[in-house]
């Protein structure tokens, strides 16, 4: 088995233990090519979280260690030089959580990975297609992600992969996102961002993780480019139909046009969520045909929206 493994699988560091990071750890451990004798898997944990964890984090840490995952003390808000030293022992770094990081953190992290000579890097780029959205999309909120891509494309020492998965399925159903809201009287409200004809791609975290593991462990997997995956690709109109059917509820439909969302964002320019909604209402770089994705061509069966609702939202 070990002869099939690319060199990048020898020592893997995962950054982030939230929904995606935890799923990636499980995805790596459960991959058919994973061999504990040939690959070590580590998780970066803040020193304070390691020494004084909350009850929830303490339980999580015990579970991770029981699975053979090494817990490594380190803070991604440390200096670039400190991060470079931290990353040097690893052949792969997989970053799985960066929405709340201060500006400049993603670039610093990428520079540290490159300076450390890490063989393989999956940056925090999970989501939409930043190349298509461009630097101006969402009032420039994704310009740092584009800078990260420019940095990676300008070098050839570290192989990299960007996983374009659309919006996380769980995020699509979060109350704060505002797209799906259960109402009294066996009703559910679905709000389209811009119009009912706008299209979105969505993938659940567990499937993003499965695809990540598949990319890491297979020597013939694509590198140095974005890889597109999809659990579902559908219009908001189709999405509303699916929600109503899966929940067996009457759907109350409303749309927030792009102009309205831009006005709301301009009133509160520091609110990232409102800027995200503008990006989704602008309609660029948000979707791709499911049948044309790498995951479909690889024969990976990913969970669609209807099945996700029946398992997680009923």
Residue ranges of each PLM-predicted region?
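Conserved residues at the C-terminal ends of beta-strands
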Residues: 96, 124, 166
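A hydrophobic C-terminal alpha-helical subdomain
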Residues: 257-314
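Short beta-strand elements of ligand-binding domains
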Residues: 119-125
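Short, amphipathic alpha-helical "lid/cap" segments that border enzyme active or binding sites
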Residues: 84, 205-213, 302-310
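Oxidoreductase cofactor-interface core, primarily capturing Rossmann-like NAD(P)-dependent enzymes
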Residues: 2-46, 50-59, 128-250, 261-265
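NAD(P)H-binding glycine-rich loop region in Rossmannoid oxidoreductase-like domains
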Residues: 50-116, 131-133
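Structural motif
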Residues: 11, 91-92, 120
